[in-house]
């Protein structure tokens, strides 16, 4: 049986801030359905944003409770773990993991990783709900 996968792209945005110690912060702008790609790629967008492709939401039976807790919440989310890294000579927020599981996101945060979230798009919710009902 094939593992359920849903291809997504991630947009990270650099936002200027007024602060004595730092001049900017990174934020997760969106997670959207995308075509399946074989490799991670990044394209600069206007407004200091970067569009990352090549990610998937993978569903694992062992995470079913975490998906259920997320989808049954008033504001279900897609979680993205990201790190500040250099990509092709530019320092940027590079996504590493996308998940729908509260538990997986919490484990990453407990491990010291940066995890942000955005509201789950309707297409992703419609994809995961039947799987969740079966598991």
Residue ranges of predicted features:
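Terminal targeting/leader modules
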Residues: 1-122
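Mixed-charge, glycine-accented linear interaction segment located at domain edges/termini
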Residues: 115-135
